[in-house]
Regions:
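A generic secondary-structure micro-motif detector
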Residues: 119-120, 803
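Conserved, single-site charged/polar hotspot
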Residues: 2-81, 104, 166, 172-178, ...
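Surface-exposed aromatic
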Residues: 114-118
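A short, hydrophobic secondary-structure junction motif
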Residues: 120, 125-133, 772-784
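Short, solvent-exposed alpha-helical surface patches in non-cytosolic proteins
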Residues: 67, 71-107, 121-136, 143-168, ...
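Short, glycine-/polar-rich solvent-exposed loops and beta-turns at beta-strand/coil boundaries
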Residues: 109-112
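Residue-level detector of short coil/turn "hinge" positions at structural boundaries
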Residues: 140-141, 824
C-alpha cells in the first residue's frame, strides 16, 4: 500500500479497553453518535499526525463473562511484515471497510446513488461505498464535500467502530490531545478485525473471511488487468483502494468479502509455497505455470515436467524450487459435490483440500470453479495429495446425454423424503456397497430410517420402469424411466432420477403443455424445453443434491403428467434441436398465457448482475402483439391499456384461454394485509426495487416492513407491452414505489391472510373461479379504485389478462398460432425473433 503523503509518527498512547471494563473520557463522543457528528481537517501545518499501532499500550481488563480474549495484540513475529504502521487511513478506504462489515457486495451495488458530493466521482472506486455509508448513516461529509482522500481521525475511527458493532469491546481512550490525530492503517485494521470477529460471533458478519493468498498479478505486471483487480493463487479478486503491486509473488494475509479484499493485514517474509499449479510449459530452464487465472514463468533447473501436470513448488529468489509433481490422478463419474467433498461412482466420497484448484483444457487452459464440474460427467481428471482432492482438470466439455433430476416430495416444496417406497413394472435390481439384489415386478423396496443408510443406493430397472409409491404426482403414482439413486442426508432421504436427456423431455413436454394442443405445438414446446434444460445442465445449480435440475417449476415441471405418444413423437422429431442466437443456445423463456401481447424482458426483470431496472432487453425476448395486423395503440399509456385489457373480444392467438381475461376485487383490508405480509420479505430480496418516500420528498431504498393502512394504489410506469413496471402504494405509515412484475404480483396477492374472512375469488373469462391464488396472475392489469364519500378506498377492481411473466413464448399462444395454420418455424420466429433452431447433437 503506497501513500504519497509525508507522515510524522507521533508517540501517542491509546489504550484499547473492553466495553464495560473502562469508561471513555468524558469528552469522547457517545457510542450512539454517528461518525458524521465529528469531522477532521488537516493540521494547520498541512499534515495529519498518525497514531501508530507500534505505540499502543495494551491493558488487561477483568474478563467479561462472554470469555472475550485480551485486547488487540501487536504481532511482533519477524516472519510477518506489518502493513501501514506509519501510514494513515483514508476516508474513502474507511467507508469501504465499514460498509463491507455490515453489507454484502450485492447489497452495496444494488443501492441507487444518492450522494451529491462535489468531490465524489461516480466512476471512482470508492463512490459506491461512500454512497452506502451515507445512506446507512455510517459516514457523511460537510459543506457539499466528502473529502475521500483525507485521513480518518481517532475519534472518527472510534465512532465508525461503534456503528459497526455497538456492543464491541474495542474502545480507545480518547483525549483532547489525540482525538483529531490520524489513525494509522495498521492500528485501524487490528481494531477493525477485532470488531468484526465479535460481530461474526453474533452471526451478523458471517460473509467476511480471512484468507491467505499469494499475489500473482495486478495491473503493474499485467496491463490487461483493470486497476483494482488482482489475480491470486486462489483466483481473481478485486482490491479497490489498495495497491498490491509491491506484493507480487509474496503471500499476504487479508480480510475479504464476496471476492473484494477489504483489508491487507500483513505480508509473510518466508518464501511462498505454491500449491496445485498447472504446468503450462517447460523449456530452456524456465517453468511456466498457470494458477488462479494468471500465467507466470520462473527459473527452473530441475527435472523435466510434463505439460498438464499439477505441482507444488516454493518460489525462492525468483526460482521454482522443491517442486513436487502430483503422481496420483484418476477419472470417475461425479455423483455429488457440495464445496467440501465430492462423491464418485466408484471411489465414494473424497474430501477437497483447502486449496482445491479447477482448470479446463481446450484451445487454452482456463481457471474454473467447482461449479464447472458437471454432475454426472466423467470428463474430469482429479489429482490427489494426502488423501484429499487437490486439483481437477476438465479435459473436455460434458455432453448432455443424460440428465440427473432431483425429485421433490408430493408437495413439490422440499427435496427431503421421510420415507421411500419403490416398486417396478418389471424386474429391477438394487445395489448397495457392491452387493446386488434382484427384485421381481411388484416387489417393494422400502427405506424408513435414514440412519441405517450409510452408502448410496442404486436402483435400476431390468425391464419396465421404476415406480415411486411414496409420492404422488398429477397423474397419480409416478413411474420413471432410467435409474434412481438414494442417499441419506440430514435425517432424510434425497432421491435422484438419472435419465436420458431426450427421455427426460418426454415427461417435461406434457407436464408443461397440454398434449391436446397438437403435434406442431408440442414440437415447439420440445425445442424450448430442450434449450432451457441445456442451459440448466451447464448451470449445475443442484450439485449439492447430486443433480443437474429438479422436477419442479424451479427448473421445469417433470413427470407431473404422464408421457404420451404425442409428447414422445414431438421430442423425437426435434431430437437435439435447440434455439440459438449468435451461435449460443438461449434460455428460451416461456409462460402460460398472454393478454394479447408479450413484454420486453428488460422491462420485466432487473439486470442479473447490477440489479438495475429497467435492464437491457435481449433482441429475441421483445414485446410483440399476438395477432398479425392488430394495432391497439401505445399500451404504455394508461388509458390505452385500460381500454385494451377491459376488451374481452380482442382477436388474439390466446383468446380461447380462460386466463386471457380475468377480474378480481380486493377490499382495503385485504390489500393492506397482503402488502404488509409480504413487504419485508420482498424488500430484503430486492432492496433496489422497493423504495420508500423520505421526508425530503425523494424515494430511496430503505428497509420497510409495513405501509400501515392502504390509502392509494396507482400505476407509475408501464412497459411497451402494457405490463406494469412500477406501482406506487401509499399507506398511512409509508409510501413505496414497487418495481418488477414479481414484486408487484407478490405484494398484492389475491388471497386471504389471517384467521377467518372469505376466500378471494378471481373470475376467469369462461366464468370459472379461482380462489386464494398464489400471485396476482400477471402484471398486465388496470385498476378501478372504489372510494367512500371521504375519498378513502373501500375496494379495488382489478381487470387483467394473461397468466405468467409475459416474456418469450406464450404456451396458449402457440396453440392459437397452430390453429391459425402457422408452422413450427414460423411460431419459433414469432416468439424468439432472430434465433435459429439448430441441432446440437
Amino acid at each position: 500500500m503506497k501513500i504519497k503523503k509525508h507522515i510524522i509518527l507521533m508517540g501517542i498512547i491509546c489504550a484499547c479497553l473492553f466495553a464495560g471494563c473502562a469508561a471513555l473520557d468524558k469528552k469522547e463522543t457517545p457510542p450512539q453518535q454517528a461518525a458524521q457528528n465529528e469531522s477532521s481537517s488537516p493540521d494547520k501545518e498541512g499534515e495529519n499526525l498518525v497514531v501508530s499501532a507500534e505505540n499502543i499500550k495494551t491493558e488487561t481488563a477483568p474478563a467479561k463473562t462472554t470469555g472475550v480474549e485480551s485486547p488487540v495484540q501487536i504481532n511482533a513475529e519477524s516472519s510477518l511484515e506489518t502493513i501501514g504502521d506509519n501510514e494513515p487511513l483514508s476516508r474513502a478506504l474507511a467507508a469501504k471497510m465499514a460498509v463491507l462489515a455490515l453489507n454484502d457486495r450485492y447489497s452495496v451495488e444494488s443501492l441507487e446513488r444518492e450522494i451529491t458530493y462535489a468531490d465524489c466521482d461516480e466512476g471512482a472506486w470508492y463512490d459506491k461505498y461512500v454512497n452506502a455509508a451515507f445512506i446507512q448513516g455510517i459516514m457523511t461529509g460537510e459543506g457539499g464535500l466528502f473529502r475521500p482522500d483525507d485521513n480518518i481521525t481517532i475519534i472518527e475511527a472510534q465512532n465508525i467502530l461503534n456503528i459497526i458493532n455497538s456492543e464491541s469491546s474495542v474502545k480507545m481512550r480518547i483525549t483532547d490531545e489525540n482525538r483529531d490525530k490520524s489513525i494509522s492503517y495498521a492500528l485501524w485494521v487490528q481494531l477493525y478485525e477485532k470488531c468484526i470477529d465479535e460481530l461474526e460471533g453474533e452471526n451478523i458478519s458471517g460473509g467476511i473471511n480471512k484468507k491467505s493468498m499469494i499475489v500473482l498479478a495486478d495491473n503493474s505486471n499485467n496491463s490487461k488487468l483493470p486497476e483494482g483487480n488482482i489475480i491470486a493463487d486462489s483466483g481473481p479478486f478485486t482490491a479497490f483502494g489498495l495497491k498490491l503491486g509491491d506484493y507480487v509473488d509474496r503471500r499476504i494475509n487479508v480480510i475479504e468479502r464476496d471476492g473484494e479484499i477489504i483489508a491487507l493485514k500483513n505480508a509473510e517474509n518466508a518464501a511462498p509455497r505454491f500449491s496445485g499449479a498447472y504446468i503450462a510449459g517447460w523449456e530452456d530452464g524456465k517453468l511456466t505455470i498457470f494458477l488462479g487465472g494468471a500465467e507466470r514463468t520462473y527459473e527452473y533447473t530441475g527435472d523435466t515436467i510434463e505439460k498438464g501436470s499439477i505441482c507444488d513448488f516454493t518460489l525462492q529468489n525468483g526460482k521454482a524450487e522443491s517442486v513436487n509433481v502430483y503422481k496420483d490422478s484418476f477419472k470417475d463419474t461425479v455423483k455429488l459435490h457440495n464445496g467440501e467433498h465430492i462423491e464418485f461412482a466408484d471411489r465414494g466420497v473424497l474430501p477437497l483440500s483447502e486449496d482445491f484448484r479447477v482448470y479446463s483444457e481446450g484451445s487454452a487452459v482456463m481457471w474454473r470453479r467447482s461449479r464447472n464440474i458437471i454432475i454426472g460427467s466423467d470428463t474430469v481428471r482429479f489429482f490427489t495429495s494426502e488423501g484429499k482432492i487437490s486439483a481437477a482438470v476438465i479435459e473436455s466439455v460434458a455432453k448432455p446425454e443424460k440428465i440427473r433430476v432431483a425429485i421433490k416430495d408430493t408437495s413439490f416444496e422440499k427435496f427431503d423424503h421421510e420415507r421411500v417406497e419403490i416398486t417396478g413394472t418389471g424386474q429391477f435390481k438394487i445395489r448397495i456397497e457392491g452387493m446386488e439384489t434382484t427384485y421381481e415386478a411388484g416387489d417393494r423396496y422400502v427405506l424408513e430410517n435414514p440412519e441405517h443408510v450409510k452408502d448410496r443406493v442404486y436402483i435400476e430397472p431390468i425391464s419396465g420402469r421404476l415406480v415411486m409409491e411414496s409420492i404422488k404426482r398429477g397423474y397419480g403414482v409416478p413411474a420413471y424411466r432410467g435409474s434412481l439413486e438414494i442417499i441419506a442426508k440430514d435425517g432424510a432421504f434425497l432421491i435422484v432420477n438419472e435419465v436420458g436427456f431426450e427421455e427426460y423431455l418426454y415427461s417435461v413436454v406434457p407436464s408443461e403443455m397440454p398434449v391436446s394442443y397438437g403435434a406442431e405445438a408440442l414440437k415447439v414446446q420440445a425445442v424450448t424445453a430442450r434449450s432451457y434444460a441445456y442451459n440448466q445442465f451447464f448451470a449445475n445449480g443442484f450439485s449439492e443434491y447430486g443433480a443437474n435440475v429438479c422436477d419442479s417449476v424451479i427448473s421445469q415441471v417433470y413427470n407431473n403428467v404422464n408421457e404420451t405418444e404425442s409428447s414422445i413423437k414431438a421430442v423425437n422429431d426435434t431430437e437435439g434441436i435447440c434455439l440459438t442466437y449468435d451461435g449460443s443456445v438461449i434460455s428460451a423463456n416461456f409462460f402460460s398465457t398472454s393478454a394479447g401481447i408479450m413484454a420486453n424482458n428488460g422491462e420485466v426483470w432487473a439486470d442479473n448482475s447490477t440489479r438495475k431496472f429497467p435492464a437491457n432487453t435481449s433482441p429475441y425476448l421483445v414485446s410483440k402483439i399476438q395477432q398479425e395486423g392488430s394495432d391497439y395503440g401505445n399500451l404504455s399509456i394508461e388509458e390505452n391499456m385500460a381500454a385494451f385489457i377491459k376488451n374481452n373480444n380482442i382477436k388474439s392467438y390466446d383468446n380461447f384461454s380462460n386466463w386471457f381475461r380475468w377480474y378480481v376485487e380486493m377490499t382495503n383490508e385485504e390489500l393492506t394485509a397482503s402488502i404488509n405480509a409480504n413487504l419485508k420479505e420482498r424488500y430484503e430480496a430486492s432492496p433496489r426495487l422497493i423504495k420508500t418516500l423520505q421526508s425530503d420528498g425523494v424515494f430511496r431504498s430503505r428497509p420497510v416492513e409495513s405501509i400501515g393502512r392502504l390509502i392509494n394504489i396507482e400505476v407509475i410506469k408501464r412497459g411497451e407491452g402494457g405490463n406494469i413496471m412500477t406501482l406506487k402504494i401509499t399507506g398511512e405509515e409509508n409510501t413505496i414505489l414497487v418495481s418488477t412484475e414479481y414484486n408487484i404480483r407478490t405484494l398484492i396477492r389475491p388471497r386471504r391472510y389471517g384467521e377467518g374472512g372469505k376466500a378471494i375469488e378471481i373470475k376467469l373469462a369462461d366464468g370459472g373461479i379461482r380462489t386464494d391464488y398464489g400471485l396476482m396472475p400477471s402484471a398486465f392489469f388496470t385498476m378501478e379504485r372504489m372510494t367512500d364519500a371521504s375519498g378513502e378506498i373501500q375496494y379495488v377492481k382489478f381487470y387483467g389478462g394473461g397468466n405468467g411473466h409475459g416474456v418469450g413464448m406464450s404456451q396458449t399462444g402457440v396453440k392459437g398460432m397452430v390453429d391459425a395454420g402457422k408452422t413450427f418455424d414460423e411460431i419459433l420466429e414469432h416468439f424468439y425473433p432472430g434465433t435459429a433452431a439448430e441441432k446440437q447433437w
